[in-house]
């Protein structure tokens, strides 16, 4: 559902970008809330799946593969958005954050479930003591929400957005502690499309916007 919500948001963003709906639509409070809920959902699921992957111990080959794939994808996203959006390019977006959180969370994978949840509280406390981005150097943009890059089309610094990743880790660790993952049967028919989307979420994230952009350009060329 998070993937579907992401596609819906980006489709609406593209409608605005190409001038088919009112400028500023996706910057309205309700759309900003929708967008942030999507980001939190993705980060929560990323943390949950990261904990699940390493539940029996850190799999270093998986770690380095993730670093390589996410690193390449994050750099690619930054380059593409630089040429597409200029000063609003993605400098530290959700892929950059997931990559960083995957590395920073390694010491917590084998700890008590309360450890990642405590880290989540520490990062999430930003929402309490700060009202939006703070005045800060661009060199700190990866760590804390600064106003230097607040206009980016996707900006997710560790504080506060990393809290959702830690919540996902803690939730999985707690559920494992409570032995809540008892079902290991086959996938039911209606769940298979969702399972497929979950397994290929990075690919969907990377290709859906180019497909939408191409579609809007073709429509504009032949129809409008």
For the regions a protein language model found, what residue spans apply to each?
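Alpha-helical transmembrane segments and their immediate juxtamembrane cytosolic regions
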Residues: 1-224
């Amino acid at each position: 559902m998070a993937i579907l919500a992401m596609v819906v948001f980006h489709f609406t963003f593209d409608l605005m970008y190409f001038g088919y709906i009112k400028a500023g639509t996706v910057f309205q409070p309700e759309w900003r809330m929708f967008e942030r809920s999507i980001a939190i959902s993705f980060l929560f699921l990323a943390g949950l799946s990261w904990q699940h992957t390493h539940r029996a111990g850190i799999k270093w080959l998986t770690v380095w593969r993730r670093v390589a794939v996410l690193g390449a994808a994050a750099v690619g996203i930054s380059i593409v958005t630089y040429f597409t959006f200029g000063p609003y390019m993605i400098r530290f977006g959700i892929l950059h954050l997931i990559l960083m959180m995957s590395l920073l969370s390694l010491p917590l994978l084998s700890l008590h479930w309360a450890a990642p949840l405590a880290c989540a509280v520490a990062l999430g406390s930003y929402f309490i003591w700060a009202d939006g981005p703070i005045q800060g150097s661009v060199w700190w943009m990866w760590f804390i929400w600064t106003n230097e890059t607040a206009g980016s089309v996707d900006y997710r610094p560790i504080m506060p957005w990393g809290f959702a990743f830690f919540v996902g880790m803690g939730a999985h660790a707690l559920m494992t502690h409570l032995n809540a993952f008892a079902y290991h049967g086959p996938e039911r028919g209606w769940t298979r499309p969702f399972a497929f989307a979950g397994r290929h979420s990075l690919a969907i994230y990377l290709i859906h916007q180019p497909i939408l952009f191409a579609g809007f350009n073709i429509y504009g060329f032949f129809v409008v």
